[in-house]
Design a protein with these regions (language model features):
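Residues that mark the start of a beta-strand
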Residues: 6, 34-37, 238, 264, ...
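Cysteine-nucleophile active-site neighborhood
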Residues: 290-362
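ATP-dependent carboxylate-amine ligase catalytic core
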Residues: 2-108, 112, 116-142, 152-156
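Phosphate-binding active sites in nucleotide-utilizing proteins
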Residues: 237-312
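Structural motif
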Residues: 8, 87-89, 113-115, 145, ...
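Amide-donor transfer/coupling interface in amidating biosynthetic enzymes
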Residues: 179-226, 235-236, 348-434
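Internal gly/pro-rich beta-alpha loop/helix module
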Residues: 122-231
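A short helix->loop->beta-strand "cap" motif at the edges of active sites that frequently abuts
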Residues: 110, 166, 312-316
Length: 434
């Protein structure tokens, strides 16, 4: 059973500084020569990009619903075999959601660090820390870190207020040079933050003066029951994948699955007007921010021509969210300006000022459920009838996302987690029916 020092970084709510602290810890321990593996709770794409920049290693999603307990167990056990430290960043507040960050921490016995923003707060900090530590008796609790502290005197007030059996891990001062900027789907992508490495190093410098600079106790991660090797259902298939600032919402586990199924992966950038590799058998257009680059994408004739030629040849195209928007006739922004897109999927996408959809999704296929999630601000108006529709497995408000087919194209707003159904993923890229 592989074992590795591990911490679960959580908070009483969103906006407390979990990502800044997790990224700072990853950068700190990496600078100390340690191999750091970071995971992000939930289906988010943006936080993992920043955490990858900090740690120097791919960041996988951990989610008891989307990834499944066995999938999470396999990812953690694999990381524990090679890493010197595992960090898991939670989502929302520690006990929010079903399943929650606390459920994940308890399932794998990972001790929790509570990051609490103390701006405009003093002794109430201790009450919040006490509640987080005691609300659930089986929760392994490591200690508490005060964030956005105003002064040394402020830090001392906070420390003195803590009950004696709650560990004070230290504090992070209020510092605009550490905070990470945000945009409408969450944090900015790493390449959009000019001084990102300086911010990460500043956070690491501050955290070096806390107890979190020390390695925590090791956690043993039991491996899941051995499963047989995956069939090489995509052996010899060459799959082209769009990857750049406009199309970046890609789970590392999805790429690993395609590789395990035998596919050869090749990447290209529509934003840089690169063609689809000419001998590709299938194409994946992931989600991202096409709305921020609509004019450039519309002007890039080389990429557009290659994608249209791929479709005309009847080769499979799988498009999710922003990738689906790129295939539409046109994209209209929040100010009413319309930009032509590829015209391969009948319909128009229109950006909204508020969420159009958010939540977990499950799509029933011929080979069982495919899990994933949805998170978008655009609305699609299309004459196409859905060939399938996902459902909300969490019972949340709103309907499941539609799946559309137009020729060799399969498109949906749903971001699929392909390891939840490898056979369906193989069918998608083979042009089969899912």
């Amino acid at each position: 059973m592989p074992a590795c020092p591990a911490l679960f970084v959580s908070a009483p709510a969103s906006g407390q500084g979990k990502t800044s602290v997790t990224a700072g810890l990853a950068r700190l321990h990496r600078r100390l020569g340690r191999r750091v593996r970071v995971f992000k709770t939930g289906p988010d794409f943006l936080d993992p990009m920043l955490l990858e920049r900090a740690s120097g290693a791919p960041v996988n999603a951990l989610d008891l619903g989307m990834v499944g307990e066995a999938g999470c167990r396999a990812l953690l056990a694999d990381a524990a075999r090679d890493a010197d430290l595992i960090l898991i960043e939670g989502v929302m507040g520690l006990f929010d959601g079903t399943p929650s960050s606390a459920d994940l921490a308890v399932a794998f016995g990972v001790p929790v660090v509570a990051v609490i923003s103390v701006k405009s707060m003093a002794q109430t900090f201790a009450a919040i820390a006490f509640g987080l530590a005691r609300f659930r008796a089986d929760l392994p609790f490591h200690g508490v870190l005060a964030n956005r502290v105003g002064s040394a005197r402020h830090a001392e007030l906070l420390r003195q207020a803590l009950p004696g059996d709650l560990r004070w891990l230290g504090h992070v001062p209020a510092d605009a040079g550490i905070a990470l900027p945000e945009r409408h789907l969450g944090l900015h992508q790493p390449n959009d933050i000019d001084d990102l490495d300086a911010r990460l190093d500043r956070a690491a410098d501050v955290l070096a003066n806390t107890a979190l600079a020390e390695l925590p106790p090791a956690v043993a991660f039991a491996e899941p029951d051995a499963a047989g090797p995956l069939p090489r259902a995509l052996a010899g298939k060459r799959i082209a994948i769009a990857r750049d600032a406009a199309f970046s919402f890609i789970y590392p586990a999805n790429l690993a699955l395609l590789d395990a199924l035998g596919a050869q992966l090749r990447f290209f950038s529509p934003l840089a007007d690169e063609p689809v590799p000419g001998d590709s058998d299938a194409l994946f257009l992931p989600g991202g921010y096409p709305e921020l680059h609509a004019a450039a994408l519309a002007a890039n004739a080389t990429s557009a021509g290659a994608i249209r030629a791929h479709a005309a040849a009847g080769k499979p195209i799988v498009a999710e969210c922003g990738g689906m928007v790129y295939l539409c006739d046109a994209l209209t922004d929040v100010d009413g300006a319309t930009t032509p897109m590829l015209g391969l999927l009948p319909g128009r996408a229109t950006m909204q000022r508020r969420f159009a959809a958010l939540g977990m999704q499950q799509l029933d296929t011929r080979t069982g459920p495919m899990r994933g999630h949805t998170f978008h601000y655009s609305r699609l108006d299309t004459p196409l009838e859905p060939v399938a529709a996902a459902v909300r497995p969490d019972g949340g408000a709103g309907s499941g996302e539609a799946v559309y087919r137009a020729g060799s194209i399969v498109a949906t707003y749903m971001h699929m987690y392909w390891p939840s159904n490898p056979a369906a993923a193989a069918a998608l890229f083979s042009g089969g029916t899912i």
